């Protein structure tokens, strides 16, 4: 009986500790995001291939999809969680900015364009042509419903950028903690022969042991790099599909209200 009470007490203590660690995890995530966004805004090249001939050759000549560590080795340790920060890049020959943006803003049909990673999606609201909220059901790393707030910005006739913040994540069935946050930052640059696409994704999952992380990509799909590659590959394949028809933005939806902003960081220790 004493052993049972001790076990119960330990279990409750662990559960309470996990609950208490969540606000700290969020604060550390907010600090990381603040530093990451400052880094993105201050870099000289709009897309990395502009100042990197080797990367440009890989994307254009070799037609490859490249992933790059955005801020050192992954995962980054958070209190009670782990964060992955990846940059992915692809060149889509023959694509145009208008067609690509139109496809990506078709939030009701994302499963048609990203069949490897998304099973369903629905646009919830929109404000004009630059602010959207939508929900999608992801297939990996598990069946996860994600609601996101998205803002598009057209910089000039040849460049777009877009940011997407998850506002709610919910794993269907048992909650393994595979995905707590999904922030993504997209850049699109049109040139004479096509469009450069670059994305930086910042994801957070619960803290897993070393063995789980080592086996994650093989057994459980805890692999944001792989998911990013799948998304870029599907994007290229879908926008180049012959006869692609993209519906107009739907009318009759509510406006989205104020755009979501991540919490700030009061400390100077963010990475």
Residue ranges of predicted features:
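Bacterial N-terminal signal peptides
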Residues: 5-15
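Cofactor-pocket helix-loop regions in the catalytic cores of large enzyme subunits
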Residues: 18
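N-terminal secretory signal peptides that target proteins for export/translocation
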Residues: 1-2
């Amino acid at each position: 009986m004493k052993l049972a009470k001790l076990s119960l007490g330990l279990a409750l203590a662990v559960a309470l500790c996990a609950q208490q660690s969540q606000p700290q995890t969020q604060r550390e995530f907010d600090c990381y995001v603040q530093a990451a966004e400052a880094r993105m805004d201050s870099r000289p090249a709009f897309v990395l291939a502009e100042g990197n001939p080797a990367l440009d050759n890989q994307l254009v000549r070799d037609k490859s999809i490249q992933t790059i560590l955005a801020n050192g080795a992954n995962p980054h340790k958070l209190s009670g969680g782990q964060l992955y920060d990846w940059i992915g890049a692809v060149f889509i020959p023959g694509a145009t900015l208008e067609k690509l943006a139109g496809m990506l803003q078709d939030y009701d049909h994302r499963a048609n364009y990203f069949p490897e990673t998304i099973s369903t999606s629905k646009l919830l609201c929109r404000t004009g042509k630059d602010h959207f909220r939508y929900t999608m059901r992801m297939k990996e790393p598990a069946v996860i419903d994600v609601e996101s707030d998205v803002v598009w910005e057209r910089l000039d006739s040849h460049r777009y950028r877009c940011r997407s913040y998850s506002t709610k994540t919910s794993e269907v069935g048992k909650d393994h903690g595979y995905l707590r946050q999904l922030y993504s930052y997209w850049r699109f640059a049109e040139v004479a022969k096509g469009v450069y696409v670059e994305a930086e994704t910042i994801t957070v999952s619960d803290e897993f042991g070393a063995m789980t992380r080592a086996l994650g990509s093989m057994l459980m799909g805890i692999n944001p790099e792989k998911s990013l590659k799948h998304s870029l590959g599907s994007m290229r394949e879908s926008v180049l599909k012959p006869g692609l028809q993209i519906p107009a933005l739907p009318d009759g939806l509510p406006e989205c209200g104020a755009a979501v902003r991540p919490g700030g960081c009061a400390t100077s220790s963010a990475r």
